[in-house]
Amino acid sequence: MTASGGGSTAATGRMPTWKERENNKKRERRRRAIAAKIFTGLRSQGNYKLPKHCDNNEVLKALCLEAGWIVHEDGTTYRKGSRPTETTVPCSSIQLSPQSSAFQSPIPSYQASPSSSSYPSPTRFDPNQSSTYLIPYLQNLASSGNLAPLRISNSAPVTPPISSPRRSNPRLPRWQSSNFPVSAPSSPTRRLHHYTSIPECDESDVSTVDSCRWGNFQSVNVSQTCPPSPTFNLVGKSVSSVGVDVSVKPWEGEKIHDVGIDDLELTLGHNTKGRG
């Protein structure tokens, strides 16, 4: 009790009073007197072999030995013939952590790659198989039935093999497409034609009235015009399409003559001379 009182004093940070020290001495003397009487009664009437200066642990050890228990020096106590496998104290608050293999690890969210799990191992050799292959497992690779199905997960997408096609139907060439016009010419010669532009007058300040160009509406060069239809090259050429200048025939009651570009007037369908 003196040691305990000193420990509590150091913990509280104050010195016990004289009255408290006297009370602690009285309790300690009473405890020792009661223990001495118990030890004397056990020695005389119980035939216990207890040392002269013993404590409560010696008494407990003697009681266990009388009851047929085994008590070691470190305090391990058990019945005869039933040695415990674990040295855990039932009243202890210490809990042993379970081993790492006590609980099964959860299944991972990803799946194994087919490149590593589908191909059989070289050790899987069947003696009944043909020996024509240099390596035994090459025969397993040759048959497509041994390949495991591809397992795909949402969390880990699997890249398809390089040899797999990118789409189910191959793309047809452009010339085999149904939208390609059949009536288009098979020869690209129509791109070589240079279309004739409308003759324009020189509107610069240096030009005069007489320097304007004159348009001839009687002769037209057929070879310089664009083809009349997409099937122009598919039809046999006539005499008029060889490149010969052909004169335009007037209708009945119509007169064709050369007209200057400046003499033409845009009337938008109305005759201005008739109004005047």
UniProtKB/Swiss-Prot annotation:
Spans annotated as Disordered: 1-30, 76-125, 155-191
Pfam families registered for this protein in UniProt: BES1_N
A GO CC annotation given for this chain: plant-type vacuole
Required for DNA-binding: annotated segments: 14-87
Extent of Low complexity compositional bias: 104-122, 164-174
Post-translational modification: Phosphorylated. Phosphorylation increases protein degradation.
Keywords for this protein: DNA-binding, Phosphoprotein, Transcription, Transcription regulation
Biased segments, Polar residues type: 84-103, 175-189
Biological process according to GO: brassinosteroid mediated signaling pathway; DNA-templated transcription; regulation of DNA-templated transcription
Entry's family note: Belongs to the BZR/LAT61 family.
Name used for this protein in its record: BES1/BZR1 homolog protein 1
Organism: Arabidopsis thaliana (Mouse-ear cress)
